[in-house]
Amino acid sequence: MAEAARDKGFEYLVISDHSKTAVYADGLPVDRVKEQWAEIDALNKDLAPFRIYKSIESDILSDGSLDYDDDILEGFDLVIASVHSNLNMDEEKATERLLTAIRNPHTTILGHPTGRLLLSRAGYPIDHKRIIDACAESNVVIELNANPYRLDIDWKWIPYAMEKGVQVSINPDAHSTGGIDDIQYGVLAARKGGLTASACWNANTMVL
């Protein structure tokens, strides 16, 4: 993945596997997290100046907490917090669940905020304004997931995010080297919403 991203002209790659709760997706228990960190450290020496960032897509549990202890979460370069389970929620429950995760000091990015899958799942209802406002207050980035079956956050909310000063990260959600190119769909959706380069968190060299 790192070599494929480098060959496409990218300066860095964020490795963000599923977390330990996502056993259906081979999520990483703590011992495998630490093994991966060691592998990334070694690869960063070999691939410099290309950089691999240590990340995790940490599950937002039903109470809004993340599924690793603080001492593990603080070891990542960035943490993407996402909902993957118990999706049948009303707007108040879903919104409060996300708000709790946003306020977690380890959360860097709120991943695919509604959990929708286009053409197959509508996603849970959320109060987008409250979510975006909370991201502004906590300096949390919102993901625009570029998988063509997600495109979540919806482009219609990009102007409000920009108005509130919330950065948007266009992420390809790549599970293989071929998935890296899905970032193009996110770029198209972002342009439809009027996202500027300065408001796109990963449009420039990342400094963490």
Predicted regions and their residues:
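Core AdoMet radical
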Residues: 15, 56-57
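Charged catalytic cores and adjacent phosphate/nucleic-acid-binding surfaces used
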Residues: 1-51, 62-208
